[in-house]
Amino acid sequence: MRIAIFTDSFLPGVGGTEKAVLGLATALAENNEVVVCAPYYSRKYKDDFQFQVLRANSIKITNNDYFAFPFTSCKFKKELKKFNPEIIHCQSVSPMAKYALSYAKKHNIPVVMTVHTKFKTAFERSIKSKVIVNALIKNLVKKLNKVKQVYTVSNDMIDELKSYGYCGEVKVIRNGATFSRINNLEEVKKLAIQKYNLANEENIFLYVGHIVKFKNLEFTINALKIIKDRGINFKMLFVGHGFDDDYFKNLCKKLGLEENVIFTGQITDKDLLSSLYGAGELFLFPSIFDNDPLTIVEAALHHVPAITIKNTGSSERITNNVSGFVVENDVQEFADKIIEAISDKAHLKQIGDEAEKTIPKDWSTTAQEYLNEYNNLITH
């Protein structure tokens, strides 16, 4: 099958959607012809994958975000026509999706779309006008109504899309795992332990992702303050970078957490990132914005359970007190659960082992679920 995946977020950008597109495209390419259609990034990067990548002209918005102009990209359009896709899968809803819908209509092929993001929350972060936000949501729903099938990665997102006014069917297909399963965990963690001087730390907590306010990191830091005030020693690793790096570093300084917290910055070395996961004992993820965060899956692959907030997409893979922890959206309860978890390291290890067994899902399984959907749409 010839499959074209359209996305506004791809490598060398950093984020969950980028990882999801890479994982899905790689798995689909095992037995299919796949092309990923994405914006051109100005920094040097070589596309070296099992699948083809077509880059559309774009302009830089941030270091991680580019606005694509596929309608004016002659080479891009020529190569896509040559590829001649049988189905198009949109992984975002911005300019690339608009072109995908236009191309599909002209060539009479089906389009499906996976929605990864709570767009209203994302829009409201940067746009103060409710009128403009509502207009953007209305435009999103208009696009959703033009595709053959809408997918998302969590049940929480089904309600989110309904709140936008979308009334069509939404199916949940969860993301796959990015790392392979870890067989030599003690060896894997040595690199991070040495680099960040963690050998004598009693309790090591971890977060991997963008360092931004909407990830609810202030919630985490306030919980850490409670834990420190109880006289508990720990080291917290914030792995990643973002617009609010300085804000959170200053907050940690203000709360007297400088000696307890390490901001590693962005980690692009896969071995070091894997080692950081392995060194952690508990993954702190109180985000109410994320839907099916791959970082929780990656932590689980390293036998590290997550603590999340109840009734969020982040918590859906977790069975409370079995494969991780789920608490109310309350800083005190979050802190209490962390303290409870680290008070019995043998039980915490059991929960981490169960997380490794039950939370990850292979990308090959996700790809097969989508292939079944593609075949059904093409033949009907």
Where are these regions (language model features)?
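N-terminal subdomain of nucleotide-sugar transferases
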Residues: 1-44, 49-55, 364
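A short, well-ordered alpha-helix in the C-terminal region of glycosyltransferases
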Residues: 333, 340, 347-361, 365
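Carbohydrate-associated surface elements
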Residues: 40, 156, 176
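Conserved acidic donor-binding segment of nucleotide-sugar-dependent glycosyltransferases
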Residues: 320-321, 325-331, 340-345
